[in-house]
């Protein structure tokens, strides 16, 4: 009898417009709740959209926000959270190697693209031979920038360099570009002198730049630096993982990403 009364109450609430129909269904059907760690900002905002979709499909999502990204994988490995969405595949692999965590990437999430910014050029077609360009000096940033430039056919890299390329791995440079490697905090100032500057998404945001609006070219959505959804190795085949991935890759979340960020946050799925 109590069950009948409860169901009638839910129906009346929906009928009267007090509760969104999807919410009522979710309240009735959620069978598992998972804790997902994210960093504040883009990843937390997107996961909130994922949470709404997942609830309508029977999966509850508790969002756990971290101010310090270095703590997220540790929390996941220690079982304090069930999944994480905050880092790209290359950073995850580096953490696995350094700390021995048994963590696996189960799906791509979004790409926060490195992009090329310029105060002198409207497109790469205007780039002149011998121009000076600025790229990050740190190993990860330099490699990412060089891979981007290779994809733009501006340079050719030694095949074995892979995602660890340095300027020594440049075997072809068709416009004889002059490269200046700078600390990340000096890249913005280089816009005054360089033909273009390669800046990653996090740094660009801090500088008030938006990749889709302000760059002359940006990284492909299916970059090897796409961010990933991560779980413990022991959990990767559990049903809730597939549910979480499906919610993230849903049309509703795709629409949210496009309308909220345009192309400054890119979708690799």
Where are these regions (language model features)?
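A conserved helix-loop-strand patch within extracytoplasmic ligand-binding domains
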Residues: 106-156, 254
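Ligand-binding "clamshell"
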Residues: 94-106, 119-121, 193, 198, ...
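Short, polar/charged alpha-helical segment
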Residues: 40-62
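Periplasmic-binding protein-like
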Residues: 108-118, 143-150, 205-269
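Beta->alpha turn/N-cap motifs
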Residues: 41, 65-69, 79-93, 110, ...
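Short helix-initiation/N-cap motifs at beta->coil->alpha
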Residues: 63-74, 161-189
């Amino acid at each position: 009898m109590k069950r009948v009364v409860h169901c009638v109450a839910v129906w009346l609430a929906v009928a009267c417009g007090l509760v969104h129909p999807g919410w009522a269904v979710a309240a009735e059907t959620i069978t598992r709740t998972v804790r997902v760690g994210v960093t504040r900002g883009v990843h937390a905002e997107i996961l909130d959209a994922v949470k709404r979709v997942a609830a309508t499909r029977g999966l509850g999502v508790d969002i756990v926000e971290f101010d310090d990204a270095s703590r997220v994988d540790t929390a996941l490995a220690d079982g304090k959270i069930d999944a994480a969405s905050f880092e790209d595949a290359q950073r995850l692999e580096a953490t696995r190697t350094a700390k021995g965590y048994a963590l696996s990437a189960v799906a791509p999430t979004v790409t926060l693209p490195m992009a090329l910014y310029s105060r002198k050029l409207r497109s790469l077609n205007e780039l002149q031979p011998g121009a000076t360009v600025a790229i990050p000096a740190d190993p990860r940033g330099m490699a990412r920038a060089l891979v981007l430039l290779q994809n733009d056919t501006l340079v050719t890299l030694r095949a074995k360099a892979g995602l660890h390329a340095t300027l020594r791995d440049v075997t072809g440079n068709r416009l004889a570009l002059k490269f200046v490697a700078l600390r990340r905090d000096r890249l913005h100032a280089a816009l005054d002198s360089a033909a273009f500057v390669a800046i990653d998404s996090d740094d660009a945001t801090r500088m008030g730049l938006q990749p889709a609006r302000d760059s002359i070219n940006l990284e492909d959505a299916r970059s090897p630096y796409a961010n990933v959804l991560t779980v413990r190795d022991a959990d990767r085949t559990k049903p809730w993982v597939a549910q979480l991935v499906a919610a993230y890759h849903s049309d509703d979340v795709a629409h949210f990403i496009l309308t909220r960020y345009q192309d400054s946050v890119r979708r690799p799925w």
